[in-house]
Design a protein with these regions (language model features):
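N-terminal signal peptide c-region/cleavage motif recognized by signal peptidases
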Residues: 45-47
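Residue-level detector of alpha-helix boundary/anchor positions
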Residues: 25, 40-42
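Lumenal/extracellular ectodomains and adaptor appendage modules
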Residues: 49-351
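Single conserved hydrophobic/aromatic residue that forms the stacking wall/gate
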Residues: 1-13
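Sec-dependent signal peptide recognition
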Residues: 34-40
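Short, Lys/Arg-enriched N-terminal segments with co-localized hydrophobic residues
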Residues: 10-13, 17-32
Length: 351
């Protein structure tokens, strides 16, 4: 274990960086404030939180069904609580242009979730794509699913359209544009008589079993022998809750393992002299990069926290503090083996 104490704090203050071999927990202290054969997939995945936490959706980056002629030469990933930005450089090593359909499938979101959930509508409104510095307007596709009695998922998009729901209404679990009760009433009237035949999980309250997945798509041509730059950005979907020390984060518990929370950080969070009582979580599906024919040529990860916060994540010794609030890691020939889970701890406002 290597400890790096900032020169302007004493031993009773927080360490600015704490990195262990193979895993790292980084934190700091400051002023409190609060895409024709092989599709390219920009993949996302959903993560569920405990009942007393706000659920969040862990979004991701490009996944490629291996085309031996196209390589990802570079990926720059920036993560903060306000924005996720990703920039890619793809090289077509063949003598012919290759056109792919690029997809960004979002996770499923249930129509029956409670209000304590991430800002999915905000994510939809913030999603932007550029190819070689030109804005891309993707097509939007929606699929709807129900859970069956045997625990499997049934694609019920066509059935719901027969019930009179439009694509826009099918997206409601994501966009929250329509009153849930009215959509639920429409589904109940249409589907309840068919529930047994459809083998839905329950014959009752069918309106609350529907979940929606949105998929963005666009055509992208990778010029022969050329490099294509693709960028996308969005507001991350955050979750969070309150800490009740000393019970959280429990030593060796799920939170400590998921975010590689060091003993120093755990003790700091449990110390009554400090007021780090709220936390924010986000996830990023990094392992999609492992689906490429070759490793990522050059990978850069930048994580930024707000002043006054602590941040912890699992990474190796390459993650370094480059400013009071920014941490960065650089890798060559990078093949990600696990996804990113990041947690930010914030100080309470004075009472």
């Amino acid at each position: 274990l290597t400890r790096d104490w900032s020169s302007d704090v004493c031993s009773s203050d927080l360490p600015s960086e704490n990195i262990s071999d193979g895993l790292s927990s980084v934190f700091g202290k400051g002023k409190p404030m609060k895409h024709t054969a092989f599709p390219v997939l920009l993949l996302a995945a959903v993560t569920a939180q405990a009942n007393d936490s706000t659920g969040f959706v862990g979004t991701g980056g490009i996944q490629y069904l291996k085309n031996p002629h196209i390589e990802m030469q570079r990926e720059d990933l920036y993560i903060s609580q306000r924005q996720i930005r990703v920039a890619y450089s793809f090289k077509n090593n063949s003598a012919q242009d290759i056109t792919e359909t690029v997809l960004f499938p979002l996770p499923e979101v249930s129509a029956g979730y409670d209000g304590d959930f991430a800002d999915t509508a905000g994510f939809i409104n913030s999603f932007r794509i550029w190819a070689d510095d030109k804005a891309v307007k993707p097509q939007i596709h929606v699929r709807a699913f129900f859970e069956t009695k045997d625990g499997k998922k049934a694609d019920i998009t066509a059935k719901l359209k027969q019930c009179g729901l439009t694509d826009d209404e099918l997206m409601n679990p994501w966009t929250q544009k329509y009153e849930r009760a009215k959509l639920s009433d429409k589904l109940v009237a249409c589907l309840t008589p068919q529930a047994a035949k459809l083998k839905l999980k329950t014959d009752e309250d069918v309106g609350n079993l529907w979940s929606a997945q949105i998929v963005y798509s666009w055509k992208q041509t990778f010029k022969a022998g050329k490099t294509t730059e693709i960028k996308h950005q969005y507001t991350p979907l955050l979750g969070g809750s309150f800490l009740i020390p000393p019970a959280e984060p429990e030593k060796g518990g799920p939170m400590a393992k998921t975010y590689c929370i060091s003993e120093d950080l755990r003790r700091t969070l449990a110390d009554p002299r400090h007021r780090f009582r709220t936390y924010t979580q986000l996830g990023y599906v990094l392992t999609t990069g492992a689906n490429w024919a070759k490793p990522i040529g050059k990978f850069t990860l930048t994580v930024e926290r707000e002043p006054g916060q602590l941040v912890s994540l699992c990474w190796d010794k390459s993650l370094r503090k480059i400013s009071p609030t920014v941490f960065r890691a650089e890798k060559t020939d990078f093949l990600p083996r696990k996804d990113l889970d990041i947690i930010f701890f914030a100080d309470l406002e004075p009472i």
